[in-house]
Amino acid sequence: MAQKKQLYVFSDFDGTITLQDSNDYLTDNFGMGNANRVNLNQQVLDGSISFRDAFAKMLDSVHLSYDEALEVLKKNVAIDPSFKPFYEWCKSQDIRVIILSSGMEPFIRALFEQYLGKEEASSIEIVSNDINVHPDGQWNIVYHDDSHFGHDKSLTIRPYAQLPESKRPHMVYCGDGVSDLSAAKETEHLFAKKGRDLIKYCEREKISFSEFETFADIHKDLQKLFFSS
């Protein structure tokens, strides 16, 4: 009897797992402001600027120390309440969850720690950019790779997609915005958050997707797609 394929859930973090995008929150409130950020996002969608360059402009406009930025995010950025039960269900079903983020790992783990607890926050799989904190408390992003995305999420997914059919897992991706463009075509099923830029991109490029509002929606859809008898 053939062994049942494992399911891998790849997910963006900011704006997908979180209710607010942490990088957008910093940029809008302590940097260039909402209008300028939205304009840069539109330029990324249009292809007139790379995500890497746009993101650098956004973060460079934020004048907070690392500690200040971390405290601001912990006070103001919440995680989708349905993510914790979703994640616990995934673990119970041997579903591998991998966070693919264009954000920065120290911020991500700190937010997870508030909502999942220290043990889960330290063990959850995260592939993301990092942070270099300077002696004076200032900080800068350290990109994951040299791509024009800064973190090309497709590079993590593709090796699994290229496995022989018998060894290839089922794969889904969950995302919301311009940082997810590189991953949008890489999995067999895509979940795109309602009202966000990723849907605009998918509609323009004719990429099929399922719309979601919370991880409760994704939970239900995964049960129908992969666990219905």
Curated annotation (Swiss-Prot):
NCBIfam families the record matches: DKMTPPase-SF, HAD-SF-IB
Domain of life assignment: Eukaryota
Residues at the active site: 12 (nucleophile), 14 (proton donor)
Record's subcellular location: Cytoplasm; Nucleus
Catalytic activity as recorded in UniProt: D-ribitol 5-phosphate + H2O = ribitol + phosphate; D-sorbitol 6-phosphate + H2O = D-sorbitol + phosphate; sn-glycerol 1-phosphate + H2O = glycerol + phosphate; D-erythrose 4-phosphate + H2O = D-erythrose + phosphate
EC primary class: hydrolase
Originating species: Schizosaccharomyces pombe (strain 972 / ATCC 24843) (Fission yeast)
Keyword line: Chromatin regulator, Cytoplasm, DNA damage, Hydrolase, Magnesium, Metal-binding, Nucleus
Subunit and interaction comment: Component of the mst2 complex composed of at least eaf6, mst2, nto1, pdp3, ptf1, ptf2 and tfg3.
Residues engaged in binding Mg(2+): 12, 14, 176
Enzyme Commission numbers on file: 3.1.3.50
Single GO MF descriptor: magnesium ion binding
Protein name: Pdp3-interacting factor 1
GO annotation, biological process: chromatin organization; DNA damage response; L-serine biosynthetic process
SUPFAM superfamilies in the cross-refs: HAD-like
Entries under InterPro entries matching the protein: HAD-like_hydrolase_phosphatase, HAD-like_sf, HAD_hydro_PyrdxlP_Pase-like, HAD_sf
Similarity-based family: Belongs to the HAD-like hydrolase superfamily.
